[in-house]
From Swiss-Prot:
This is Probable cytosol aminopeptidase. InterPro entries: Leucine_aapep/pepB, Macro_dom-like, Peptidase_M17_C, Peptidase_M17_leu_NH2_pept, Peptidase_M17_N. Presumably involved in the processing and regular turnover of intracellular proteins. Catalyzes the removal of unsubstituted N-terminal amino acids from various peptides. GO terms for molecular function: manganese ion binding; metalloaminopeptidase activity. Binds 2 manganese ions per subunit. Its cofactor is Mn(2+). It comes from the Bacteria. Its main location: cytoplasm. It comes from Trichormus variabilis (strain ATCC 29413 / PCC 7937) (Anabaena variabilis). Mn(2+) 1 binds at D265, D343, E345. It catalyses: Release of an N-terminal amino acid, Xaa-|-Yaa-, in which Xaa is preferably Leu, but may be other amino acids including Pro although not Arg or Lys, and Yaa may be Pro. Amino acid amides and methyl esters are also readily hydrolyzed, but rates on arylamides are exceedingly low; Release of an N-terminal amino acid, preferentially leucine, but not glutamic or aspartic acids.
Length: 491
């Protein structure tokens, strides 16, 4: 699908489908829209009245029109109340239009949308992101794709002439989101530690990034006992991925994104039982997928910031070689961990990844992981939990979340709760009591970052959508890519 920019006035545009956005408290047609309605023989007013269109956010109405009008179809989309209007309103409205257009077999859609904050650059980028993400469909594993012949071919943004750079930026970011979606959606017999490393190598080759893949023996030399303990039972070799983007000039900042990379999680010897959702555990590498997606986008955008993309990738499987409940592992910073639950493995892999990253001399680290069900219980499916002792870093991520529309909520790091992780025979256990489980998980990770400002994002909820949700789903969302890109660019 192509995104095009048009300098044609609304009154002069002609084509297949015209989409017009209206606010909930301003559905009465005035000015240019009143003139357009007159040109269209009153069809807009008639559509609003007959369909009882109120302009509620993301609501749509559709009609086909007669041959003597210069468009064949009309879509009205609601923007909600003006006081609630934000940049993500445009993304979601564009997504709603794209879905209606696809359903109605529109080939070309002209979008007439207002500006957010009088900013044509941010507005056009958001609209382009929304419609592309909504129209993406993953047919890789279908022998007979179910959307043949119903693709929108072109979307024209009316009144946004000159915003080519913004559209290019949107395309770059969307390419990263789609990569993350594809990695998360693919089954564990398709995406493995080996193929994840190959994907990272392809990104490095395509966009000129530096790459280092640490093999098992390399990780052994670095003392990564926590990561390798998880990897013991898998027949597939673990891969420790380190991609680096370096700008041509001296970087303003040096940052790292660290993603949890379990390409399948059986639970280990604490196996996930019936009803546990074990069949969905291909998604447990959602953090690593977002990390690689962000790498792909940032490598194209080329900001003046050095960024390291790191993931310890393996499977958590069952075999005679598997780590046992009660085993003690030694992480690469020397801390010992009593494994009281083999199904709390992600934090073990992240422990060694964070120790490694902390030694790089960076200005900030953000890790993201499908870490705990407790975070989903607390915040639901749409919101990631943010855990950090650093107020400045929290503010940066909250601003990036506001701009990207990928929601986060700062959670407490209550140090007292670390008491629940104390072990009688090791430095700590890998899980604590059930209450505050997402907090104790974050406190566990905190033990492996010594010198660098650090934040943890628990993305267990928003990494996957069970049903359609704006420009996401159903399926893998690619959550985290846009948030992380905005964070890096804000630097």
């Amino acid at each position: 699908m192509a995104i095009q920019l048009s300098d044609k006035p609304l009154l002069e545009w002609a084509g297949d489908t015209l989409a017009i956005a209206l606010f909930e408290d301003a559905v009465e047609l005035t000015g240019e829209l009143a003139s357009l309605d007159e040109k269209f023989a009153g069809i807009l007013k008639e559509l609003i009245a007959e369909e009882e269109f109120t302009g509620k956010a993301n609501s749509t109405v559709f009609t086909r029109v007669s041959a003597n009008i210069p468009v064949r179809k009309i879509i009205l989309v609601g923007l909600g109340k003006t006081e609630a209007f934000n940049i993500d309103t445009l993304r979601r409205a564009a997504a709603a239009v794209g879905k209606v257009g696809k359903k109605q077999k529109s080939k070309v859609i002209g979008l007439s949308f207002p500006l957010w904050n009088n900013d044509p650059t941010a507005s056009s980028q958001a609209i382009a992101e929304g419609v592309q993400l909504a129209l993406y469909q993953d047919n890789r594993f279908k022998s007979d794709p179910d959307d043949k012949g119903s693709q929108v071919e072109t979307v024209e943004l009316l009144g946004f002439a000159g915003q080519e750079a913004a559209i290019n930026r949107a395309n770059q970011i969307v390419s990263g989101v789609i990569l993350a979606r594809q990695l998360v959606a693919a089954p564990a017999n398709s995406v493995t530690p080996i193929t994840m490393a190959e994907t990272a190598q392809q990104i490095a080759q395509d966009y000129g990034l530096q790459i280092e893949i640490l093999e098992q023996e390399d990780c052994e030399k670095l003392g990564m006992g926590a990561f390798l303990g998880v990897a013991l039972a898998s027949d597939l070799p673990p891969k420790f991925i380190h991609l680096t983007y370096k700008p041509e000039s001296t970087p303003k900042r040096k940052l790292a994104i660290v993603g949890k990379g379990l390409t399948f999680d059986s639970g280990g010897l604490n196996i996930k039982g019936a009803g546990s959702g074990i069949e969905t555990m291909k998604i447990d590498m959602g953090g690593a997928a977002a990390t690689l997606g962000a790498a792909k986008a940032i490598a194209q955008i080329k900001p003046n910031v050095e960024v390291h993309f790191i993931s310890a990738v393996t499977e958590n499987m069952i075999s005679g070689k598997a780590m046992h409940p009660g085993d003690i592992l030694t992480a690469s910073n020397g801390k010992t961990i009593e494994v009281n639950n083999t199904d709390a493995e992600g934090r073990l892999t992240l422990a060694d990844a964070l120790v490694y990253t902390d030694k790089l001399g960076l200005d900030a680290i953000v890790d993201l992981a499908t870490l705990t069900g407790a975070n989903v219980i607390a915040l639901g499916d749409d919101i990631a939990g943010l855990y950090t002792p650093d107020d400045a870093l929290a503010g940066q991520l909250e601003q990036a979340a506001s701009e990207s529309g990928e929601k986060i909520w700062r959670m407490p790091l209550e140090e007292k709760y670390f008491e629940g992780l104390k072990s009688g025979i090791a430095d700590m256990k890998n899980t604590g009591p059930r209450p505050g489980g997402s907090i104790t998980a974050a406190l566990f990770l905190k033990q492996f970052v010594k010198d660098t400002p650090w934040a943890h994002l628990d993305i267990a909820g928003p990494v996957w959508a069970d049903k359609e949700n704006g420009y996401n789903g159903p399926g893998a969302t690619g959550y985290g890519v846009r948030l992380l890109v905005d964070w890096v660019l804000s630097e």
